[in-house]
Amino acid sequence: MGIEEKLPSGVLLSTVEGLAGYMRKASFWPASFGLACCAIEMMTSGGPKHDLGRFGMEVFRASPRQADVMIVAGRVSQKMAPVLRQIYDQMPEPKWVLAMGVCASSGGMFNNYAVVQGVDHVVPVDMYLPGCPPRPQMLIDAILKLHDKVQHTKMGAHRAAEIEELETAALRALPTSEMKGQLR
């Protein structure tokens, strides 16, 4: 016997988190951080053929203070890493990061001293998108998966703990120069 029985039909019960998640997922404002060829595919996804506006991402923001999702598209150089972190820090909470392409995810074919081997060494990444470069359809699919993640993400201390865990894991990660692999 709860409150559900006392309410008239047609009244929807939900949590504030559920409602806020539903609203947040429908109004992503992306900050574009296009660094290489993946940025061309990202721009294509905003055009009339693919129309990201259908998913609430109508305008790519030039200001990080107006954005809540950062799409890092392409390789990140060592000199660009502090700028990327500064832009991430300027974004208001809650914020999410999508690493678009192999270069943003793992450094790609640029396994050298000048390129960061994965943007997750600089900012916490919520979604990785493979491909070189990934097609606009793949970007839209990743955004829809990020929508689902955002809708079911708990607010407040839970999200802060998740970000702290991601940043700690990135700082503890072994530098790529010390890893043994195909290119070493």
Swiss-Prot record:
Top-level taxon in the UniProt lineage: Bacteria
Enzyme Commission number(s) from the entry: 7.1.1.-
Positions annotated to bind [4Fe-4S] cluster: C37, C38, C103, C132
GO cellular component, as recorded: plasma membrane; respiratory chain complex I
Co-factor note (free text): Binds 1 [4Fe-4S] cluster.
Gene Ontology biological process terms, A to Z: aerobic respiration; electron transport coupled proton transport
Protein name as annotated: NADH-quinone oxidoreductase subunit B
Annotated gene: nuoB
